[in-house]
Amino acid sequence: MDSRITTILERYRSDRTRLIDILWDVQHEYGHIPDAVLPQLGAGLKLSPLDIRETASFYHFFLDKPSGKYRIYLCNSVIAKINGYQAVREALERETGIRFGETDPNGMFGLFDTPCIGLSDQEPAMLIDKVVFTRLRPGKITDIIAQLKQGRSPAEIANPAGLPSQDIAYVDAMVESNVRTKGPVFFRGRTDLRSLLDQCLLLKPEQVIETIVDSRLRGRGGAGFSTGLKWRLCRDAESEQKYVICNADEGEPGTFKDRVLLTRAPKKVFVGMVIAAYAIGCRKGIVYLRGEYFYLKDYLERQLQELREDGLLGRAIGGRAGFDFDIRIQMGAGAYICGDESALIESCEGKRGTPRVKPPFPVQQGYLGKPTSVNNVETFAAVSRIMEEGADWFRAMGTPDSAGTRLLSVAGDCSKPGIYEVEWGVTLNEVLAMVGARDARAVQISGPSGECVSVAKDGERKLAYEDLSCNGAFTIFNCKRDLLEIVRDHMQFFVEESCGICVPCRAGNVDLHRKVEWVIAGKACQKDLDDMVSWGALVRRTSRCGLGATSPKPILTTLEKFPEIYQNKLVRHEGPLLPSFDLDTALGGYEKALKDLEEVTR
C-alpha cells in the first residue's frame, strides 16, 4: 500500500465522483499517473484499474508515463501562429535539446503542443505545468529555460516577488486582463453583495425567476437559451436534490472573457450562483474550471472563503435559516468537448467527458441524475447585476431579441486586443473601428464552431442572436492571412478534440480535413467541394452533440463567404481518376495489407 495514495483517497473520502481531482493529485505527486497505483486507487474507489485508465486517457493533461520534471505546453492556436509561434517553438527545441512530443534523457523537460489556452490577446503563450508565461519571444524562452536548468521553479520565474497564489497580484503578475471598455454591466462600479442578497431574499424564489425572465437574459455560453426559463424548468422538476453548475470550461479557441470575469469580478459570478440556488431550490453548486486556468484556483478558493466568512455562502445565507448553499471548484483536465453541458456533467461525476443523449436534458436529469441548471460565467455575473438594477434596466440595452450587453474577446489583426463590453446590436464595422483593425478581411465569430464572415459583405450586420450570434470570440484576420490555412488548422482542432463517441464527428471531420489539405495542395476538383458541402451537412445533422454539429462550419462558412479561396485552387478533372488519387500511396496500402495478413496467418 502506497501511503501517498491512501492520503489522496482520504482527502476525497474515496468518492468516485471526485476521480478527476484524485487524478490531478496523483499526477502532482508522481509527475504522471503510473500503472502501479491503479489497483490501489481502484480498490478505494470501487473501480477497476482499466476504468481509471480509460477515464484518464480521455483528458489531454493526464500523462501515463514520465514526461519531464517540467512539462511545457505551447499553445498552437491560429492566433499564436500569426504572432510568432514558430520562432518560439524552435527556441524551445533548441534550448531543451529535444523535439516536441519528446522528453529529454535526463527527465527534466517534456515539450507538448496544446490548443488555445484562453490567452489569445497575449500570444504566444505557454503553460509550464500550472504556471503561465505570455507574450513569448525566443529571447524570453532562452532566459526561462536557463533559469529552470539553474533550479528555479516555474512559479519563481513567473512570480519573482513571491506573491501568494491566493492574491489577485499573483494572477496579474502572469496574465493581463486587458479590459478595454467598461460597460454598464460587468466591470463598472462595486456591487454591495450583502445588500443585493438581502434584496433577493425579500422576494419569493418564483419572483426572482420572473425577474430574470422579464430581463430577457439569454445564456452567454453560445446557445442563447432563456436563463429564466431554464431556471423555471429546473425548479419545477420533481426532486428534493438539485444542483447549479457554472460552466467555466472556456475551451472555444479565441475566447477568454470568462477568464477575465473570474479574475476581475469573481464574487459577482459566485453571488449569481447563490441567487440561482435560491430561485431553483438547491444546496450545492459546482464551478467547472478548465485545467488551463489552474493558476486561478487558489485565488478563486480565497474569494469563496471570503463569501463564507461574510455569511454570503454556506449555512444560513444572509441570516435566513434553511437557506444553505455552498460551491466547490471542479478542475477540468484539457478536453474541449467538456464545454458541452452534458459532457461537463459527466466529467463532474468523475467520468470521461462524453456528451449524453438528449432528452432528458440536464434540467430534468443532470448531475448525479438530479435536475441541474448549467449556466455560463458571464450569465451568472449578469444575473447579479440584473437583480441589483432591475429587469427594465437590463432590457433597455441591446435589441428586442438580444437584451443587455455582450463581452467580446477580441484578438488577431488589430492594435487593441482584449475585452470589450458592447451592447447587442453593434455592427461588425463598429467593433472593427473600436479595436483598431485595419485592412480586415474576415472575422471569426464565436470561434471555429461559429461563422467566418466577410468584412466586405457583412460589415453592417449586427452582433445579435437574430443576426450574427456570438459566444464572445471575435477573431480578426487581415488581407495577408491565408484563410485556407486557417480553415485547415480549425478542422485539425476538431479532429483532435472529437470525443470519438459518434461516427459522424469522429470520422467525418477526418475526411473533411483531408479534403481541405487536397485543396491547399492543388489536388482537388469540383467534386471534392461538392463532397465537403454534403459531408459537412451530414456531420451537422447526425452528430451526437452541439459541438460535433458545429464542427464543419470552418469549411461551410468560408465556402459561402469566400468561395474564391477554394475555386482558385481547383484543378480540372479529366479521365477516370480524381486528381487527389495517388497510385503509389494506394499500392503501398495494398502491400502493407498483404504483409499484415501474412503475419496474422503465420
UniProtKB/Swiss-Prot annotation:
Q: How is the cofactor bound?
A: Binds 1 FMN.
Subcellular location field: Cytoplasm
Secretion signal: which residues?
none
The molecular function terms in GO held by this entry are: 4 iron, 4 sulfur cluster binding; FMN binding; hydrogen dehydrogenase activity; metal ion binding; NADH dehydrogenase (ubiquinone) activity
Residues annotated as binding NAD(+): 219-228
- Which is one Pfam family of this protein? NADH_4Fe-4S
Ligand binding (FMN)? 332-379
Write the record's keywords in alphabetical order, separated by commas. 4Fe-4S, Cytoplasm, Flavoprotein, FMN, Iron, Iron-sulfur, Metal-binding, NAD, Oxidoreductase, Plasmid
Report the top EC class in one word.
Answer: oxidoreductase
Cite the Gene3D superfamilies for this sequence: 3.10.20.600, Glutaredoxin, NADH-quinone oxidoreductase subunit E, NADH-ubiquinone oxidoreductase 51kDa subunit, NADH-ubiquinone oxidoreductase 51kDa subunit, iron-sulphur binding domain
Please tell me one Gene Ontology term that the record gives under cellular component: cytoplasm
Q: Which reaction does it catalyse?
A: H2 + NAD(+) = NADH + H(+)
Cross-referenced CDD domains? TRX_Fd_NuoE_hoxF
Iron-sulfur as UniProt keyword: yes
Under the heading SMART domains, the entry gives: NADH_4Fe-4S
Q: PANTHER family, from UniProt? A: NADH-QUINONE OXIDOREDUCTASE SUBUNIT F
What subunit structure does UniProt give?
Tetramer of an alpha and a gamma subunits (flavin-containing dimer), and a delta and a nickel-containing beta subunit (hydrogenase dimer).
Role this protein plays: Subunits alpha and gamma of HoxS constitute an NADH--oxidoreductase.
Tell me the protein's name. NAD-reducing hydrogenase HoxS subunit alpha
Species source reads Cupriavidus necator (strain ATCC 17699 / DSM 428 / KCTC 22496 / NCIMB 10442 / H16 / Stanier 337)
